[in-house]
Curated annotation (Swiss-Prot):
A motif ('HIGH' region) lies at residues 47-57. GO terms for molecular function: aminoacyl-tRNA deacylase activity; ATP binding; valine-tRNA ligase activity. Its EC number is 6.1.1.9. It is found in: Cytoplasm. Catalyzes the attachment of valine to tRNA(Val). As ValRS can inadvertently accommodate and process structurally similar amino acids such as threonine, to avoid such errors, it has a 'posttransfer' editing activity that hydrolyzes mischarged Thr-tRNA(Val) in a tRNA-dependent manner. It comes from Chlamydia abortus (strain DSM 27085 / S26/3). The gene is valS. This is Valine--tRNA ligase.
Length: 940
């Protein structure tokens, strides 16, 4: 293949789509449960059907695909199950907004069935977009096993799991204080609440003691909940209030009397040492109320307004009620003061609304029975967490785990499979079959199903099982691929999802859901902001931001900061835009290269640009090789390689490749994706292209050595290319597959068997229809010459010396140099000559016994070997001028330093270390000056 017939630049447009269609149509991604290969399964963290893929999705699915492609090539029966999540709260919210903006209707304007029909339509449209985007990224999923968390199989699994836990008493229902989102009007689990620190107030309120002229002052951050107070609590050790124990205080506005009680939970140093107890609206108060059997009075509606229990304040929002109550307390002389106070406020992770502790009848999973097994799976390394520092986080969380609220007041989701008898609320039926229970069917008017749905994380917690066919009895996938190999996900959902999968899956089948968990960091983008004309910070977006990302200097007044990706901050990077601009391989490699083991991944446009250039480097490296192996055949490779014809550079690259494979295997075992990428990058770019190919170019062009040597190099290039591209394939599948298919065209059909140590495995790889199903590169079994690395290091130092002299003399990097060497007795550099000539840009190396007298040269010394670079005749005058300038500079420096060091005053006052440094610099300058003088003398 002529080099000119091969496009000079890699253009992924068009190629990627065609390649993916080829892979998918050939069913290369489809797993066989009946295979006798060892299993390797991953279940995809299902993206929500709420929109399009973001950069986090691109990251997590790239990392999984890298593992999947590596393991598939390594001989495993690979099963990567894709899927999407119904995402209860998120999807219902998005669809509600869509219906309101398009039809002007709210959810309550539809029947439940009508609304759900709209959600299903949204799901079908959105899911198709998401799956298309996963294909663009190159994800080699088994599409025949596509799952959805609301499909019939998932619904059967959810109902079965619920009933198993219900029958064992692990699921219960009761009036409990939950995290209530007044915007979405649903309960949230503890870990769905995010906490923010905000500036607030501590209010001091006076309560009058009944039948006495005394009063007690209480400090609170929420005066509006006074309407639901059922006690005042003090510490039993607080002597200030001990005489009031058992007394009652009058509660204004609602005309109730509430007791003063003693409780160990009260901190006597907080506020006045007396606190109001509102069990229905504070978690600590709830526990106190349960302990003392206090009434629990809910004062809020589901939308966060004061209800009928608030008397004259009924119908007001919380905020308005607070203002009105403070005003009314002031009028009654019951308001004392307010002080600034830092508040820790819970907000909904989904709507951003301030969470309200709210007394509500909900379903819970009791976690006490599972705590030991959750802890043991990880503590015993049955499940290994990477990075290991997250193991401590996991165990701490498990030790402090509270019962999980699993009911949600939504329409979109898995309906709770429980029916209530209308005339007897305590009469319940839990049913996991199809349709409705027989008893309900006989008397449907007397029964109603629980209107709530299950928390999305309940169905997601069963994901490893449902992806593999559970609970269906004939389930070969489950037998073959469960437990799965690894879960790859963000560290931010370790508790949301990972722990719940361990809990639910082990409770259902008695086995862990996966062996490893890799937790990647969260992606941060660089944001830039400046003050606008109004004196407000504004974020910079568009072309200006892109220019700064690419290295443009920041002007005065512009501040840069790494922050979580946010549209409002202008630092969101769209993976689909990046694929369109740079190609999928560049995006994949950029993401892998920064997938470190920390909590933060810094990502900007420069990385995509760098790896686009690297994809082009791969292309051009292969392009050069194809131009030199166009006449090579499979028969040539089958005949093997004569190792007696291998040079130092050949052993160097083969040994380097073997070392690379070993290091890559370790990196894959430890999920070190950044190392996988950078090691493959550096080996291809530096070891293979910049060093090895440069060394053998003269042989390839027929300028050095014999035709037999040339053929050996061509064979070795083909072997190395198929192997190195194979190493790169998991991280850059499109460019490597394109080149692999072209290499197969060049080599032709392989009919011959081969047992050669160097070429056999390369031929086995080339027999495959695609890298997707090709065997992974193997270590090449050759005997490495003794002292290979020491010898190669010496050759590199000789090259470095030549390059250094070239730089000193300011010779053109393309100029061919003439060099002489004088070796110590018993030392020869004959083995290194081809390498040193190729890398040093040397036309000839002459072996001498003494320095020449008739030519001008610049000399360097490497391990006793004197190496001289002859100064080209046309460069002598320029070099002499340069040396004269350097001589003058050194003489001035020596004179100045000598004068300073001869000063007794300087020596007396200066730090001894400074004096020593000045003396050392003077000594080095004198040595350098003598070298310059010697060189100038040689010009005469």
């Amino acid at each position: 293949m002529e080099e000119d017939a091969f496009p000079k630049a890699y253009d992924p447009k068009g190629l990627e789509e065609k390649l993916y269609a080829f892979w998918e149509e050939s069913t290369m991604f489809t797993a066989q449960a009946a295979s006798d290969k060892p299993p390797y399964a991953i279940i995809m963290p299902p993206p929500n059907v709420t929109g399009i893929l973001h950069m986090g999705h691109a990251l997590v699915n790239t990392l999984q695909d890298v593992l999947i492609r590596y393991k598939r090539m390594s001989g495993f029966e690979v099963c990567w199950v894709p899927g999407t999540d119904h995402a209860g709260i998120a999807t219902q919210t998005v669809v509600e907004r869509h219906l309101y903006s398009s039809l002007g209707k709210r959810r309550v304007d539809f029947s439940r069935e009508e609304f759900l029909e709209h959600v299903w339509q949204w799901k079908e449209k959105s899911e198709g977009v998401i799956l298309s985007q996963l294909r663009q990224l190159g994800c080699s999923c088994d599409w025949s096993r596509l799952r959805f968390t609301m499909e019939p199989l998932a619904n059967r699994a959810v109902k079965k799991a619920f009933k198993i836990l219900f029958d064992k008493g692990h699921i219960y229902r009761g009036n409990y204080l939950v995290n209530w989102d007044p915007v979405l009007q649903t309960a949230l689990a503890d870990d769905e609440v995010e906490y923010e620190e905000k500036d607030g107030w501590l209010y001091y309120i006076r309560y009058r003691v009944v039948g006495s002229s005394e009063h007690i002052v209480v400090a609170t951050t929420r005066p509006e909940t006074l309407l639901g107070d059922t006690a005042i609590a003090i510490s039993p050790d607080d002597e200030r209030y001990s005489h009031l124990l058992g007394a009652k205080v009058h509660l204004p506005f609602v005309d109730r009397e509430i007791p003063i009680i003693a409780d160990m939970s009260v901190d006597p140093l907080f506020g006045t040492g007396a606190v109001k107890i509102t069990p229905a609206h504070d978690k600590d108060d709830y526990r106190t109320g349960m302990h003392h059997n206090l009434p629990m009075i809910n004062i809020l509606t589901p939308t966060g307004e004061i209800n009928e229990n608030g008397g004259i304040f009924a119908g007001l929002s919380k905020e308005k009620a607070r203002e009105s109550i403070i005003t009314a307390l002031e009028t009654l002389g019951l308001f004392v003061k307010k002080e600034p106070y830092k508040l820790r406020v819970g907000v909904s992770y989904r709507s951003g609304a301030v969470i309200e502790p709210y007394l509500s009848k909900q379903w819970f999973v009791s976690v006490d029975s599972f705590r030991d097994s959750l802890r043991e799976f990880v503590a015993s390394d049955a499940i290994k967490i990477f990075p290991p520092e997250f193991t401590k986080n996991y165990l701490t969380w498990v030790n402090n785990l509270r019962d999980w609220c699993i009911s949600r007041q939504l329409w979109w989701g898995h309906r709770i499979p429980v029916w209530y008898h209308k005339s007897d609320a305590h009469r319940m039926l839990c049913y996991d079959g199809e349709g409705i229970p027989e008893e309900v069917a006989k008397d449907p008017e007397s029964w109603e199903q629980d209107p709530d749905v299950l928390d999305t994380w309940f169905s997601s917690g069963l994901w490893p099982l449902t992806c593999l066919g559970w609970p269906d009895s004939e389930c070969g996938d489950l037998e073959k691929f469960y437990p799965t190999a690894v879960l790859v996900t963000g560290h931010d959902i370790l508790f949301f999802w990972v722990t719940r999968m361990v809990l639910l899956c082990s409770a259902m089948v008695g086995k862990k859901p996966f062996s490893d968990v890799f937790l990647h960091g969260l992606i941060f983008g660089k944001s830039y902001k400046r003050y606008n004309d109004l004196g407000e910070w504004t974020y910079i977006t568009g072309e200006e931001k892109y220019a700064y990302d690419m290295g443009k200097a920041l002007p005065k007044g512009v501040i840069a900061k790494w922050e979580k990706l946010s549209k409002s901050k202008g630092n969101v990077i769209d993976p689909l835009e990046m694929i369109a601009k740079y190609g999928a391989d560049a995006v994949r490699m950029a993401l892998c290269s920064c997938a470190n083991r920390g909590e933060q991944i810094d990502l900007d446009y420069r990385l995509f640009e760098e790896y686009k250039n690297f994809a082009n480097k791969i292309w051009n490296g292969a392009r050069f090789i194809f131009s030199h192996i166009s006449n090579l055949t499979s028969q040539d490779l089958a005949r093997g390689i004569d190792t007696t014809l291998l040079g130092l550079e050949d052993y160097y690259i083969l040994d380097g490749f073997n070392r690379l494979l070993k290091e890559l295997h370790s990196a894959y075992q430890n999920y070190a994706f950044d190392k996988i990428t950078t090691m493959a990058y550096e080996f291809f770019r530096n070891n293979f292209c910049s060093t090895y190919i440069e060394i053998i170019k003269p042989t390839l062009y027929g300028k050095q050595r014999s035709k037999e040597d040339q053929l050996t190099k061509q064979k070795l290039l083909a072997v190395l290319l198929v192997n190195i591209l194979g190493v790169l394939h998991p991280i850059a599948p499109f460019v490597t597959e394109t080149l692999f298919l072209k290499l197969k065209e060049v080599i032709g059909e392989i009919k011959e068997e081969c047992s050669d140590a160097i070429t056999a495995h390369a031929l086995a790889m080339l027999r495959a229809d695609s890298y997707v199903v090709a065997p992974y590169p193997q270590s090449i079994d050759i005997v490495i010459p003794e002292h290979l690395h020491e010898s190669f290091a010496l050759a590199e130092r000789l090259v470095y010396t030549v390059r250094n002299i070239r730089g000193e003399m300011q010779l053109d990097s393309r100029a061919s140099l003439e060099v002489f060497v004088i070796c110590p007795e018993g030392v020869s550099i004959e083995t290194y000559v081809p390498m040193v000539c190729a890398l040093g840009g040397i036309s000839s190396i002459e072996n001498l016994t003494e320095e020449p007298k008739d030519r001008i040269y610049s000399l360097g010394v490497v391990e006793g070997i004197r190496l001289g670079v002859f100064v080209p005749v046309e460069h002598i005058a320029k070099e002499k001028t340069r040396l004269e300038k350097e001589k003058t500079r050194l003489e001035n420096a020596i004179e100045s330093a000598s004068r300073l060091l001869s000063s007794e005053s300087f020596r007396a006052k200066a730090n001894p270390d400074l004096v020593c440094a000045k003396e050392e610099a003077l000594k080095n300058n004198r040595i350098e000056l003598q070298s310059i003088l010697d060189k100038l003398a040689s010009f005469s």
